[in-house]
Amino acid sequence: MALKKDFVKFDKVDKSYDGKVLVVKDLQLDIEEGEFVTMLGPSGSGKTTCLMMLAGFETPTNGEIYLDGKAISSIPPHKRGIGMVFQNYALFPHMTVYENLAFPLRVRKIPKDEADKKIDKALSMVSLQGFASRMPGPVSYTHLRAHETRYD
């Protein structure tokens, strides 16, 4: 039987957005070509961050990511040959637009006054200032897309 080589490899990968809190810590993951892998975990556990790093939309704070044996952490997304379909709108239906936007900031332990400023700025950038207290259900598809706004 021939030895299979790792097709995707996360080698001791860390990711921090603020330089303090690690959202991905010491990830060691080896995926063989043709292998099917499912990442499971609660909201805020780093699943999407790992996929964003693999696709090149985020960079690891430490460690290296390999694709077919080649280090790719410094290669821009358009040169990696990886397609990415962003996750379905993972909004909490029991929380307002504001609370949905605040959730990842709370996970990252951003102080409330700083989080409020970031949320106000994000809502303003996508012309949704008046939607902060609404539930996501009555928000249109276009507005749902705006929820994917990045803060950094």
Cite the ranges covered by each PLM segment.
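ABC nucleotide-binding domain "signature motif"
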Residues: 61-71
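Conserved ABC ATPase signature
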Residues: 74, 134-141
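Helix-to-loop junction immediately C-terminal to a conserved catalytic motif
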Residues: 55
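Conserved small/polar residues in nucleotide/adenosyl-binding loops
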Residues: 45, 142-149
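Short coil-to-helix segment of the ABC ATPase nucleotide-binding domain corresponding to the Q-loop/switch region
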Residues: 95-103
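Conserved ABC ATPase "signature" region
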Residues: 9, 69-73, 106, 111-131
